[in-house]
Amino acid sequence: SFAIGLAIALITALIRISTRGGFFKVIKVIFRFYVWLFRSTPLLVQLFIVYFGLPYLKISGIAPEGIKLDPLTAGIITFSLNTGAYCSETIRAAILSIPNGQWEAAYSLGMTKTKALRRIILPQALRVSLPPLANSFISLVKDTSLAASITIVEMFEVSQQIAAENYQPLIMYCLVALLYAVACTILSWLQGYLEKITSRYVMTSH
C-alpha cells in the first residue's frame, strides 16, 4: 500500500504544482479535493465506506449490483489513497522548497522542465521529504491494525481470536503492542540510518 501510495502522491504533487492552464486547472481542482477529502476524514471511516459502502453504489452498465470488494483489496485501496493524500503534501512542499536558482541552472544547461525535474529537483526533494515520508510509513504500519475492522486477518485480528479462545485479552493485546513497538523502533532506526547516508551524500557532492 505504501508503494502504491507513494506513486499516487508523486503524481498528485506534480499535478498540483503544475502551472499549466486550461482544462488542466479542472484536474488540479479534482486532485486538491481528493487530498482534502482523505486528509479531513478518519481512516476507519474511509475503510468502512470502501468495504461496506461501495456495494450499495449501483452504476448502470458498469456495476449494476454495486462495487463489491474483498477485504484485502478494500484495505489496499483505502490505505493507498490515504497514504497518497498525506504524502502528496509532503512531496509537494519538498519540491517547492528547492530554490528557483536550481531550475534556472538546469535551464541554462539546456535541460527541459521534465529533465530538470527528474535529474535536479526530485533527487533534492527526496532528501528533504525522507524524514516525513518515513514517519508516514511508520504510521501506516500502526494503522494496519484498523484492517481488522473489515475482517482482514492481520496481527491484531489474530490476537483477538486467540484472546477469545483463552480468555486472556490483556496478555494478547500487550503482546501485540510490544510487537508493534519493536517493529516501529526498527523502522525508526532505519529511518535515521537512511538520513545519515543521504546527508553524507549531499556533503560529499558539495
Regions found by a protein language model. Give the residues of each.
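Transmembrane alpha-helices and adjacent helix-loop boundaries
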Residues: 1-206
